[in-house]
């Protein structure tokens, strides 16, 4: 088996170099064909990127948005100079509200618009009697009378007295305005509609008039749109809202859809930007520290591999998602190591060993090791498939495909390019193993074998310590903190929250399970009681609620009187006379679904998750109905739950899969364990460092663990396999570890710098969401690589003194090299 593999690598080395021109031509065609696959890449931005299609939350949200629409844009109109909201309803103001709402409704992707004028028109419909009726036939009057009758039936004297007094005052105010002057152009009538008998904004209107100096317009987008389509619709709605110009007011329009679109736009362009920065940094590192001929060749090799990777992703249907922005710099950082190792090994064979067959030697020695570390990475990335988040799993597939493509490129292209180069112009130079980088790696690994046991004890302590502090590391779950606080959208969101107390929505819908209408008394009673109960139970999250039931219930909410649920027939009548946009946002046309919309206060997804849990736990709807929380807040909390659900398990699965692979491939428990020890050290020490530095983790750290496992085991496996190779040459353990360090030191240090730079570049992002992820992974990778260079050598020495490392690996004859015909005086260099 061993000789067969050696013959294969020799054959590859000879023929790739001998036919370098043909290899280059085939490679170009192959790159063009695979590169075309990049044009087939799609950016997945729907909610199916965050939630699994078989998740109940996903299915409920799809149904909810089909019924009641998608995200809401909030347009806040703030009066200035001591003016109050009633001053908005001049003929000019009414015309402006009408024009802006009509233009917004005409935007493709907008489902409906409820302006302050719409809310007042609805109130007017409730106050005014039907054609041919009297004031006692008006819906508002009926609801007040019914509330008094309920108090009378209950014998509640205090409520009766309070309701009588309120009804008298209300009637007096209304009757003071002649019937023909009860129109929205009459300032006195507008004041009657807006203000209750105590002079405050009527409770039923608070969702649209939070106080007497602010009015709110809600633009509802179509449901189940992608982020791109949502963004286009939001842009159109914002453009319409810019025409909401009323003298003496300040207008602000914002919403979650604008924030998501902004993040999405950044991520699309950001991947190339960060990738470009990573390329520039890596080029600088190679120029300054990688003292070889054609020192930028590894970068070219990995860029070809990246083209293959993204092209394959396009052909395989692997989508790009919000997480994949990390893909390009990560693949560059990890993948360039392969090309650096191959390049350095070839020059080592030429310059130091003066091998008659340097390309074959390099291919035989490093080729199998590169395959091992590639499988290390593949198994680490396959662990990401355990994630409950679709876009994280897609990222795992992208990395898996990418690392395989980069490995192939890093073997084929250097063997061909450097093979023909060494054939035509052999490299000459001094022994680089005595250089600064080689000496540094020898020094890092110079601890004696006797240090192995203390190191093992310290490693265990560090790992345990990291496990203890890990739960204390804060995970940033407030979406507004995922982006730069200088972002205009964030400033608008915070401004809106400061003005009206909330900036987002939490939707809850009650649906019939038997196809019957929900405009029944049991359901109306339940919705009324549930709405108020959840507001009281979650005061830190929920600001107010609006629904067709809440509107009528709030009309009868009188100080000093016990709340009374409205009659179902009255609620049905109110919905029948409501403007179309209010109808579509509060109930389905057939009455089998009712919507409750809570305005939520600023806060984290964790805060909202607690409210969602409370709603689910307290539901207990009437028979024949089901209550379901939904909307963006629920999608966000579902995403958070999925991310946190197996955050630690992803890392442990990556460790377990890589360990099992190494156990099989290296045929030794000791060799497999040695490869994994630095990973555990790095995990614990990095966690402690992150905790001590106070770095807040972002949700993207879900993929950080497997990335660190892949990077660290790549280095530990290369060190271990090179050590065994030197032992096979007859060197004693100490000499073998020193030769390994000195000869591979340059490649390891340069590789370490490029790997760290690749992920550290992400920390230069303007998005804290990415910046903290980049810091998290860069710190872990740096510590992991340092652990591999410091901790692994003494452990290897200690174990090999007991013949646990080299056992079974030193026997067997090598296959002869392939002889190559002379060409000038450098024929042997080709081989």
Where do the PLM segments sit?
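Hydrophobic, glycine/alanine-rich multi-pass transmembrane helices and their short helix-loop junctions
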Residues: 285, 371-413, 418-421, 659-662, ...
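Interfacial helix-loop-helix hairpins and adjacent transmembrane helices
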Residues: 1-28, 408-463, 481, 728, ...
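Solvent-exposed, non-transmembrane loop/terminal regulatory segments of multi-pass membrane proteins
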Residues: 23, 38-88, 94-95, 99, ...
């Amino acid at each position: 088996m061993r000789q067969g593999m050696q013959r294969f690598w020799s054959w590859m080395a000879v023929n790739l170099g001998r036919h370098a021109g043909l290899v280059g031509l085939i490679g170009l065609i192959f790159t063009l064909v695979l590169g075309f696959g990049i044009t087939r890449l799609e950016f997945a931005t729907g909610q199916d990127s965050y939630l699994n299609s078989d998740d109940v939350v996903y299915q409920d949200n799809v149904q909810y948005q089909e019924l009641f629409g998608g995200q809401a844009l909030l347009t806040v109109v703030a009066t200035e100079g001591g003016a109050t909201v009633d001053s908005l309803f001049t003929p000019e103001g009414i015309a402006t509200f009408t024009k802006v709402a009509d233009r917004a409704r005409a935007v493709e992707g907008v489902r409906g618009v409820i302006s302050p004028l719409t809310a007042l028109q609805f109130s007017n419909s409730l106050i005014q009697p039907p054609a041919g009726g009297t004031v006692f036939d008006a819906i508002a009057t009926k609801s007040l009378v019914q509330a008094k009758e309920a108090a009378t039936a209950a014998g509640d004297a205090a409520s009766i007295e309070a309701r009588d007094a309120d009804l008298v005052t209300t009637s007096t105010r209304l009757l003071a305005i002649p019937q023909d002057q009860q129109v929205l152009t009459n300032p006195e009538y507008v004041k009657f509609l807006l203000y209750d008998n105590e002079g405050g904004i009527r409770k039923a209107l608070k969702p649209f008039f939070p106080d007497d100096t602010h009015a709110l317009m809600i633009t509802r987008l179509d449901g189940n749109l992608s982020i791109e389509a949502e963004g286009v619709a939001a842009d159109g709605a914002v453009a319409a809202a810019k025409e909401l110009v009323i003298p003496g007011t300040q207008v602000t329009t914002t919403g979650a859809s604008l924030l998501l679109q902004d993040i999405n736009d950044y991520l699309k362009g950001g991947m190339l930007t960060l990738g470009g920065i990573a390329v520039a940094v890596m080029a600088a590192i190679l120029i300054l520290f990688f003292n070889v001929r054609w020192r930028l060749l590894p970068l070219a090799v990995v860029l070809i591999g990246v083209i293959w990777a993204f092209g394959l992703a396009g052909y395989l249907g692997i989508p790009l998602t919000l997480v994949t922005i990390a893909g390009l710099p990560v693949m560059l950082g990890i993948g360039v190591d392969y090309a650096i190792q191959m390049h350095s090994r070839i020059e080592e064979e030429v310059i130091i060993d003066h091998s008659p067959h340097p390309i074959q030697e390099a291919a035989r020695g490093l080729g199998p090791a590169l395959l091992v570390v590639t499988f290390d990475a593949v198994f680490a990335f396959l662990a990401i498939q355990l994630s409950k988040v679709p876009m994280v799993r897609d990222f795992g597939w992208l990395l898996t495909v990418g690392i395989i493509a980069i490995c192939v490129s890093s073997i084929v292209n250097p063997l061909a390019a450097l093979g023909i180069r060494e054939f035509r112009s052999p490299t000459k130079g001094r022994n680089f193993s005595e250089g600064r980088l080689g000496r540094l790696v020898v020094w890092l690994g110079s601890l004696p074998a006797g240090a192995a046991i203390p190191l093992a004890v310290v490693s265990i302590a560090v790992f345990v310590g990291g496990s203890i502090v890990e739960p204390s590391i804060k995970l940033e779950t407030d979406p507004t903190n995922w982006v730069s606080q200088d972002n205009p959208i964030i400033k608008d969101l915070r401004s809106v929250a400061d003005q009206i107390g909330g900036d987002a929505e939490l939707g809850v819908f009650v649906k019939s399970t038997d196809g019957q209408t929900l405009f029944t008394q049991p359901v109306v009673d339940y919705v009324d009681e549930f709405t108020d109960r959840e507001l009281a139970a979650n005061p830190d999250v929920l600001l107010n609620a609006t629904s067709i039931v809440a509107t009528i219930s709030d009309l009868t909410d009188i100080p000093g009187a016990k709340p009374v649920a409205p009659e179902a027939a009255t609620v049905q009548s109110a919905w029948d006379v409501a403007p179309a946009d209010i109808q579509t946002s509060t109930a389905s046309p057939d009455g089998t679904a009712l919507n409750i919309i809570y305005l939520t206060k600023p806060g984290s997804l964790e805060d909202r998750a607690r409210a969602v849990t409370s709603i689910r736990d307290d539901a207990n709807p009437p028979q024949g109905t089901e209550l379901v929380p939904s909307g963006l807040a629920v999608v966000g909390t579902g995403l958070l739950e999925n991310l946190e659900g197996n955050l630690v398990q992803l890392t442990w699965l990556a460790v377990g899969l890589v360990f099992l692979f190494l156990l099989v491939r290296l045929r030794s428990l000791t060799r497999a364990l040695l490869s994994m020890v630095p990973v555990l050290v790095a995990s614990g020490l990095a966690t402690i460092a992150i905790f001590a530095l106070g770095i807040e983790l972002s949700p993207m750290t879900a993929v950080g663990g497997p990335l660190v496992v892949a990077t660290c085991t790549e280095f530990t496996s290369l060190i271990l396999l090179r050590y065994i190779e030197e032992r096979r040459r007859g060197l004693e353990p100490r000499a073998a570890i020193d030769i390994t360090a000195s000869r591979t030191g340059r490649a390891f240090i340069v590789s370490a710098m490029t790997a760290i730079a690749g992920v550290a570049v992400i920390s230069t992002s303007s998005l804290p969401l990415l910046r903290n992820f980049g810091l998290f992974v860069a710190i872990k990778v740096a510590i992991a690589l340092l652990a591999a260079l410091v901790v692994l050598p003494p452990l290897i020495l200690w174990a090999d003194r007991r013949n646990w490392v080299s056992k079974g690996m030193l026997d067997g004859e090598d296959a002869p090299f392939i002889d190559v015909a002379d060409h000038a005086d450098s024929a042997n260099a080709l081989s």
